[in-house]
């Protein structure tokens, strides 16, 4: 494995389509208030805003836990238990200098080292071209997280896509629509970052959930998506610029058959943790079935 990443959940071989996943939203799955209150989170946010006035807060889904049903049973195979959190809470917990202490305290107080952490759920894609390459992006030096490192296309599912406003309520977010947002958000991120047309992309298959240990175990759902374009066609679309072109400075293609040994190459240390998680899951869930 790699100390920067851990695997929370691995889906069955080939991955899970949207209809095999369900979500349950509840305030019980939210972050616990910090010991001594949340004043520290607000103080961190205000100091970050002074340094980076372009930052904006937004609601996010919080992953509390995920459970796979025993194989062979009818109905959805994966249950996601989700709460709500925010970007502000992420910076004030997962990214705070006190994150390691918060994990220790959560384990002591609640038997859950993530209890006090925002843990906003991200999405990422192992995106394959028609000529059997996987797509990576070199992150811009301007992005807040992992500047200059190599990543897979990805981002976050957005509660505001289902319920406009800054303070969505759990009861206004039906599980079925949340699962659809999770799966459609990864396609939207690919279109925005790589600039390929939506109709060139297959329906995503969920590979599993990986945790970024450099941001206190923050989780990302990693997917496999097939593109009907060749690597050269994808490169041309990327070079013509998309809505989030500013987030990356270059596109990199690596042969699918190299994935099992990517950890032994000089590219591996350049990968950010979320990309490492996507590759580990791709190799275990999809790589063996292609």
Curated annotation (Swiss-Prot):
**GO terms of molecular function:** GDP-mannose hydrolase activity; metal ion binding; UDP-sugar diphosphatase activity
EC number of the protein: 3.6.1.45
Keywords for the protein's UniProt record, in alphabetical order? Hydrolase, Magnesium, Metal-binding
Q: What does this protein do?
A: Hydrolyzes UDP-glucose to glucose 1-phosphate and UMP and UDP-galactose to galactose 1-phosphate and UMP. Preferred substrate is UDP-glucose.
Q: Which residues bind substrate?
A: 56, 87, 139, 144, 151, 156, 158, 274
Q: Where would I look for the motif Nudix box in this sequence?
A: 175-196
As cofactor, the record names: Mg(2+)
Specify the domain of life of the species encoding this protein. Answer: Eukaryota
Question: Where along this sequence does the record place binding of Mg(2+)?
Answer: 189, 193
Q: Which source organism? A: Bos taurus
Q: List the disulfide bonds.
A: none
Q: Does the keyword Hydrolase apply?
A: yes
Q: Does the keyword Ribosomal protein apply?
A: no
Catalysed reactions, as listed in the record: UDP-sugar + H2O = UMP + alpha-D-aldose 1-phosphate
- The residue ranges of the Nudix hydrolase domain are 118-285
Q: Which InterPro entries does this entry report, sorted A to Z?
A: NUDIX_hydrolase_dom, NUDT22/NUDT9-like
What the record says about family reads: Belongs to the Nudix family.
Put simply, this protein is called Uridine diphosphate glucose pyrophosphatase NUDT22
């Amino acid at each position: 494995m790699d100390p920067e990443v851990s695997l929370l959940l691995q889906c069955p071989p080939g991955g899970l389509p949207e209809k095999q996943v369900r979500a349950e939203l509840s305030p019980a799955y939210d972050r616990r208030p910090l010991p001594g209150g949340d004043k520290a989170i607000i103080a961190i946010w205000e100091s970050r805003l002074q340094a980076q006035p372009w930052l904006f807060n937004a609601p996010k889904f919080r992953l509390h836990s995920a459970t796979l049903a025993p194989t062979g049973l009818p109905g959805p195979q994966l249950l996601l238990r989700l709460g709500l959190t925010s970007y502000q809470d992420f910076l004030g917990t997962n990214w705070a200098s006190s994150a390691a202490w918060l994990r220790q305290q959560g384990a002591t107080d609640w038997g859950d080292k993530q209890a006090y952490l925002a843990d906003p759920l991200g999405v990422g894609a192992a995106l394959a071209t028609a000529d059997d390459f996987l797509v990576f992006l070199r992150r811009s030096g301007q992005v807040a997280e992992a500047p200059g490192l190599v990543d897979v296309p990805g981002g976050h599912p957005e509660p505001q896509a289902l319920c406009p406003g800054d303070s969505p309520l759990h009861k206004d977010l039906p599980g079925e629509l949340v699962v659809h947002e999770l799966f459609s958000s990864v396609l939207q991120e690919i279109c925005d970052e790589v600039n390929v047309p939506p109709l060139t992309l297959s329906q995503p298959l969920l590979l599993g959930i990986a945790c970024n240990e450099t941001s206190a175990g923050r989780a990302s759902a990693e997917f496999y998506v097939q593109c009907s374009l060749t690597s050269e066609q994808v490169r041309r679309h990327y070079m013509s610029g998309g809505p989030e072109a500013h987030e990356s400075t270059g596109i990199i293609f690596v042969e699918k058959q190299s994935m099992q040994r990517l950890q032994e190459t000089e590219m591996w240390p350049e990968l950010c943790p979320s990309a490492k998680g996507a590759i580990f899951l791709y190799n275990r869930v999809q790589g063996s079935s292609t």
